[in-house]
Amino acid sequence: MKKQWIETINNAWENRTLLNEENTQNTIHQIIEEVDKGRLRVAETENGNWKVNDWVKKAIILYFPIQKMETIEVGPLEFHDKMKLKSNYKELGVRVVPHAIARYGAYL
């Protein structure tokens, strides 16, 4: 699957009209979910050296044009963004102080 994802992302990177295709959008969403859960990373160590997964970085950038802007209301606060906010900080074991924000796709 990873090989297919890389090919789909690299093709969409070179030809942005492919962002209109359902398969491309589904691939991007699957990659973002994997990054969100910490199973896939933009950069990782390999044999003691850091390696950048360019295709993951490209998928994150390509995520923005396929998302719609939406208003997100949290208590008295209002945001207007293309990415959902993360939730369930307690279950994630993460301390979040007032007005800290993490978006969906960020592994904590």
Please report, for each region that a protein language model flagged, where it lies by residue.
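Structural signal for interior beta-strand "rungs" in well-ordered beta-sheet cores
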Residues: 90, 94-108
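Terminal amphipathic alpha-helical/low-complexity segments used for targeting or macromolecular assembly
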Residues: 1-95
